A protein has these predicted regions:
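Catalytic cores and adjacent flexible loops of soluble metabolic enzymes
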Residues: 1-191
Length: 191
């Protein structure tokens, strides 16, 4: 087992933390019970979880639901780290990530150019995680250091789009960074 191999479990994962296309909206109280269950199961297995990842594979998260759920978790378990796994199915993924950033979340799942999806989401519009390059760009503009090179991420996103042969949902790969736009503007003025 993972324990026999010295692989500690450090994170619990709460699936569908913000809602489900089959069950509908899930109450904060239900999610808190699931967090408690994850914490209890870890202790029974001989581990202490350092964090909980809240997942939203079906795209239900909004800034308000992120604020409400993280606030409730932090009021009950202030020492627990929180990570977010957000999909942009309904166009609120980046806004939900922004809310998480404002609340001090430092771990986010993202995918190049928004690759991925949720095959069990019961909707035709289930897209992948928030776009890595879009999220890194937003962080950079906010003064949050990610250690990522946004220009290189844009190159990789364009390659990914070529490989899959269809448009992918990334934005900054089309619009470019503000740094690049400002440089182009200065060149035009100088000419």
């Amino acid at each position: 087992t993972f324990k026999d191999r010295g692989m500690p479990v450090e994170w619990g994962i709460i699936l569908g933390a913000f809602g489900c296309n089959y069950e509908g909206e899930l109450s904060t109280e239900l999610i808190l019970r699931r967090v408690q269950l994850a914490l209890d199961e870890a202790v029974l297995a001989g581990f202490t979880l350092k964090g909980i990842k809240l997942t939203d594979a079906m795209g239900w998260a909004t800034p308000q639901s992120v604020e409400r759920l993280i606030g409730a978790i932090r009021s009950k378990w202030p020492e627990l780290e929180i990570a977010l796994h957000l999909h942009d199915t309904r166009g609120t993924g980046m806004a939900a990530a922004y809310a998480g950033l404002r609340l001090g979340v430092t771990k986010f799942d993202a995918s190049i150019a928004g690759l991925g999806g949720c095959p069990f989401a019961a909707t035709d519009g289930a897209v992948g995680n928030i776009c890595t390059e879009d999220f890194a760009f937003m962080c950079e503009e906010m003064g949050v250091d990610t250690g990522l090179d946004v220009e290189k991420l844009i190159e990789v996103a364009k390659i990914a789009e070529d490989v899959v042969g269809r448009p992918l949902p990334g934005h900054v790969m089309r619009g470019g960074t503000l740094k690049a736009a400002k440089a182009r503007g200065r060149q035009r003025v100088a000419a």
